[in-house]
Regions:
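Long, contiguous, secondary-structure-rich segments that constitute the structural scaffold
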Residues: 1-71, 77, 88-91
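Cysteine-centered iron-sulfur cluster-binding motifs in ferredoxin-type domains/subunits
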Residues: 71-92, 125, 157-178, 189-208
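Carboxylate/His-rich catalytic cores and anion/metal-binding grooves
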Residues: 82-140, 199-205
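Phosphate/diphosphate-binding loops
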Residues: 135-142, 146, 155, 170-172
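Gly-rich Lys/Arg/Thr-decorated short loops/hinges at beta-loop-alpha junctions or inter-strand turns
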Residues: 150-158
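Short glycine/acidic-rich loop motifs that flank beta-strands on beta-rich extracellular proteins
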Residues: 185-186, 216
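Conserved small/polar residues in nucleotide/adenosyl-binding loops
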Residues: 218-224
Length: 228
């Protein structure tokens, strides 16, 4: 028999609609900016104080006065989760494959993934209400277990996720050999020949988009042949 590698349910989340922030343009324009971008607060002497982002930043800001700066925007109103961008990213960047055996172990390596969010109830709001009604640890375990199943007619949301090229990227600060570095154009750079494979960057990435390919298909041991 042949064992197929099915990846349809990879990166699929049920009952997690509370982390999806969706609204209409009318509501977005009528709400105050503090509603969408609340001012950060720190606790001092058990009192909360409003601070600016620069005051709580541990790192010095980069010089953005010169050079080009790149930006990528995704229209989530148009995204249908087809996965064509994942295939295009593979082709454009010549991303190496890991083989069918590794894919069966959920080790498929893409630089771009699409998270799929399905509601356990009819809507994401219904899921939020279900979570609000949870009473106690036992009820929590059973309820969240049931929410792992999607509704027959669920509300669906798609979220393409790739490297965010963070301003002060966590993957850069933990690399012991500076293989991950920050470029002048705002991009997160990676020096492959400097990497020693600690994978600290993957552990420290909040978006879980750092991928490792430990298999080198270009250095396979080939049978030696001698001529007489």
């Amino acid at each position: 028999y042949h064992e197929f590698a099915c990846v349809q349910l990879h990166n699929t989340l049920m009952g997690r609609g509370d982390i999806i922030k969706e609204t209409t343009l009318e509501i977005f324009n009528t709400k105050d900016k503090e509603y969408w971008n609340p001012i950060p607060k720190v606790s001092k002497n058990h009192m909360e104080y409003e601070v600016t982002s620069s005051e709580v930043d541990m790192w010095q800001s980069f010089d953005r006065s010169i050079g080009h700066h790149f930006n990528l925007s995704i229209d989530l109103n148009s995204c249908t989760g087809c996965g064509a961008c994942v295939i295009a990213c593979h082709a454009e960047n010549n991303v190496p494959v890991v083989g069918k055996d590794e894919v069966r172990k959920s080790r498929d390596m893409h630089w771009l993934r699409i998270d799929l969010y399905y509601s356990s109830g009819e809507t994401f709001k219904a899921d939020d209400q279900t979570k609000e009604d949870i009473d106690g640890l036992g009820d929590s375990l059973s309820t969240f277990g049931k929410m792992e199943q999607a509704s027959q007619n669920p509300q669906v949301a798609f979220q393409p996720v790739m490297c965010q090229h963070c301003n002060h990227a966590p993957c850069e600060t933990v690399c012991p050999v500076a293989a991950s570095s920050h470029g002048r154009q705002g991009q997160n750079h990676m020096a492959y020949n400097r990497c020693v494979g600690t994978r600290y960057c993957a552990n420290n990435c909040p978006y879980k988009v750092r991928r490792f390919n430990s298999v080198s298909y270009t250095h396979l041991t080939l049978p030696t042949r001698s001529t007489v």
